[in-house]
Amino acid sequence: MGVELYKHNKVAYEKVEKMFEKENRVAVVHPTGSGKSFISLKWLYDNRDKKCLFLAPTLAIRDQLIRHIKSSGLELSDFKNLEFAIYPNFASITDEFLEQHHYDCVVLDEFHRCGATEWSKGINKLLNHNPNIKVLGVSATPIRYLDDNRNMAEELFHGNIASEISLAEAMAKGILPVPTYIQGIYSFQEDLDKFQARIDRLTDEDAKSRFQDLLNQAKKRLENADGLEEIFKKHITDPSGKYIVFCKDTAHMRLMMEETKKWFKDIN
């Protein structure tokens, strides 16, 4: 019994173990969906005789690890020395608490979040109180692009990256599926009205007639084109899947929350 890893994560884990022989802080940078959480889980399982701490940005990620424990045929009782915490709560951790709680190993899930002003306070206290602690960090995006492009793999792990796989590399190797891009126009009436208004303002009758014919042809093609409902029916094969709709701003998002109900009504 134990934690099974995919081939690419087995290779990464071997590199993690090798690097820990010389370093106290090791990072893994793999894309979302590649199973890097199982690398963390295996490391915690292999060090279950030590005092371990799993830190994550949200309760959802903590709960995900617990689900991984159970899906691996294990129980929380197999991790008697493991504690869980989330960065927001850990930010206010006291020196007194850390003096009474010694940790040998810590996992920093989505470690780029540790660069946040408040959340970093608790992490810094933890590392200062435990200078010899072993730290495993996992992230898909170690660069904080909106924070002066800080590289948290450099700041927290001194560049000790045991394994790094880019999203493009993961797709090329078959670790992640290659997305299929389907294009469709769902909102064109406003543009058609603008073109019609321009045509109506033309004074050259020949040009006016020519552009009107082109616009009429475009309208006919759009009328015969599949709507989003049909496109979704054709290309979404998993009705129970999770889907995300990107919007340009909050106002657009509120508008689209109602609009997308029509898109998905025949799917789920």
PLM feature spans:
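Conserved pre-motif I regulatory segment
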Residues: 1-29
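Inter-Walker segment of RecA-like/P-loop motor cores
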Residues: 59-102
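Interdomain helical connector at the RecA1-RecA2 junction of SF1/SF2 helicase-like NTPases
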Residues: 147-241
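SF2 helicase catalytic motif II
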Residues: 98-144
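Conserved RecA-like ASCE P-loop NTPase motor core of nucleic-acid helicases/translocases
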Residues: 51-58, 242-249
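Pre-Walker A (Motif I) flank of P-loop NTPase domains
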Residues: 21-27, 50, 239-242
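Conserved helicase motor "Helicase C" RecA-like lobe of SF1/SF2 P-loop NTPases
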Residues: 248-268
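Walker A/P-loop
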Residues: 22-43, 246
